[in-house]
Amino acid sequence: DSDFDQSIIYETDGMFIDNRAMAGRSSRSYFDEGRLDDLKKAIKSGDYLFMQFAHNDANKEKEERYVTPEQYEEYLLRYINAAKERGAQPVLVTAIAMRDCDDTPDGKFSVSFPEYRDKMLEIGDKYDIPVIDLGKATADYLNTVGDEGSKKLFMWLEKGAYEGYPDGKQDNAHLQQAGAKAFAGLLAGLIRSYDRDDKLDKVKAELA
């Protein structure tokens, strides 16, 4: 459920999207604020719980957010178990790539937060949970559009282009609308091509 009409792309008569994400939260702080408790009141049998963390979990400067990769597993299991207890299907999604090409030796984009991605893949195998590797897919995509193309996806804004950012902005973490649509399209494509088991078949049918 989105407050922005332009963001409603993949909802259908048979699939309602309730976006419970909150900016600046990690798997730890989201839980500590009681947001999982709120989610548990809404989720029901037959639902899917897609979860993506890591950007804030890896931030050692924010004690209330930071978790080690090992603690990351502990927190993700709380979300996984909450979904299962209510007859819903948990789905893990690796964190999208950041615009890091300015910091890599070869100027290429890389998978962000690799230790957390690896842990999520491990959790998927260990507990038989579907994993959508959006982290790798977005890094690969950014390498196709390149340095300049990536600026049109992330919040690289010219001075005066937007009223809310009169001085412009250079943000390598957050997406513009074009980036959000591109990455959502990648996610939808990965769901459509998921063939490890039949756990996502209901969503795949709605995206067909």
What do these predicted ranges mean?
Residues 1, 19-33, 60-67:
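Acidic/histidine-rich helix-loop elements
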Residues 1-21, 37-45:
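Serine-esterase "nucleophile elbow" of acetyl-processing enzymes
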Residues 34-177, 181, 185-204:
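Alpha-helical cap/lid subdomain in secreted, periplasmic
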Residues 207-208:
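Short, solvent-exposed mixed-charge patches
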